[in-house]
């Protein structure tokens, strides 16, 4: 019976790790899509403002965004379900020492799920903000072009407005590049943190699996501390005796 429940727990952990790996890859691609969206709009100068469908050039990216968002939401829901099953298992497990180790593993998976959920919503919000801004700026440029073609006069005010508009677009491009660098740095830090958590978890697992080794290490540390105290006391006494002898 214990072997069956142990296999059930290992199956849940395997499912959680597989879903976490899939989510990590999806979120990296999702972040790259968000970054490339603004860059492609900047290279085009506008999203085909002369067309009656201003989203035509970005329609493929919009469809890809919607598809990836749905896939990530489904993966997050599946991972949440696996975590809930792991929580039910830990509550029904009966051995206190084993239950503590399982709770530690469950909390680590919950932290990973929380990080992925936060990163997904943040990236999605950034994408929506970029798309709205690009649509707004494309509409402004379309109005300007319509005004120029209707009047047929390139007056000074219109030229200044266009220059200011281009300047704002260049500023937005620099800001987006800075954000992309920051997001890449965050991804690297998240990956390193995951590696450190994995190492810490393995060390705890080894310590729980081999309590005799853990007890031996503790006794060695206590003996080292005791020897250090004794050595310090001997050195202190010798120093006092030398000082008394020197000043006698």
Swiss-Prot record:
Transmembrane segments: 228-248
Keyword Transmembrane: yes
Coiled coil: 10-30, 68-92
Main location group: Golgi
Residue stretches of biased makeup (Basic and acidic residues): 41-50
Entry GO CC: cis-Golgi network; Golgi medial cisterna; Golgi membrane; SNARE complex
Residue ranges of the region described as Disordered: 37-60
Any one of the GO BP annotations: endoplasmic reticulum to Golgi vesicle-mediated transport
Keywords from the UniProt entry: Acetylation, Coiled coil, ER-Golgi transport, Golgi apparatus, Membrane, Phosphoprotein, Protein transport, Transmembrane, Transmembrane helix, Transport
Subcellular location field: Golgi apparatus membrane
PTM-bearing positions, type Phosphoserine: 139
Gene Ontology MF annotations: SNAP receptor activity
Pfam families xref list: V-SNARE_C
Function, in words: Involved in transport from the ER to the Golgi apparatus as well as in intra-Golgi transport. It belongs to a super-family of proteins called t-SNAREs or soluble NSF (N-ethylmaleimide-sensitive factor) attachment protein receptor. May play a protective role against hydrogen peroxide induced cytotoxicity under glutathione depleted conditions in neuronal cells by regulating the intracellular ROS levels via inhibition of p38 MAPK (MAPK11, MAPK12, MAPK13 and MAPK14). Participates in docking and fusion stage of ER to cis-Golgi transport.
Complexes and interactors: Component of several multiprotein Golgi SNARE complexes. Identified in a SNARE complex with BET1, STX5 and YKT6, in a SNARE complex with BET1L, STX5 and YKT6, in a SNARE complex with STX5, GOSR2, SEC22B and BET1, and in complex with STX5 and COG3. Interacts with GABARAPL2.
Family designation: Belongs to the GOSR1 family.
Protein name (Swiss-Prot/TrEMBL): Golgi SNAP receptor complex member 1
Protein's organism: Pongo abelii
Organism lineage: Eukaryota, Metazoa, Chordata, Craniata, Vertebrata
Gene: GOSR1
């Amino acid at each position: 019976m214990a072997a069956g429940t142990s296999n059930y727990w290992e199956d849940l952990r395997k499912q959680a790790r597989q879903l976490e790996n899939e989510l990590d890859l999806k979120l990296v691609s999702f972040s790259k899509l968000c970054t490339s969206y603004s860059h492609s709009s900047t290279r085009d100068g506008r999203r085909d403002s002369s067309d009656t469908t201003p989203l035509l050039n970005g329609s493929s990216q919009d469809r890809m965004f919607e598809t990836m968002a749905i896939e990530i939401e489904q993966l997050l829901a599946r991972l949440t379900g696996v975590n809930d099953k792991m929580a039910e298992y830990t509550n029904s497990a009966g051995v206190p020492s084993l239950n503590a180790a399982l709770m530690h593993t469950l909390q680590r998976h919950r932290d990973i799920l929380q990080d992925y959920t936060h990163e997904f919503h943040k990236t999605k919000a950034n994408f929506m903000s970029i798309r709205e801004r690009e649509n707004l700026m494309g509409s402004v440029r379309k109005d300007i072009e319509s005004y120029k073609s209707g009047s047929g006069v390139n007056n000074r005010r219109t030229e200044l407005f266009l220059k200011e508009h281009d300047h704002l677009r260049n500023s937005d491009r620099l800001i987006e590049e800075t954000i992309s660098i920051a997001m890449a740095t965050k991804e690297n830090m998240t990956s390193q943190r995951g590696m450190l958590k994995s190492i810490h978890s393995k060390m705890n697992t080894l310590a729980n699996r081999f309590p005799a080794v853990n007890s031996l290490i503790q006794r060695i540390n206590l003996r080292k501390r005791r020897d250090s105290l004794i050595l310090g006391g001997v050195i202190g006494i010798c120093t006092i005796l030398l000082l008394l002898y020197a000043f006698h």
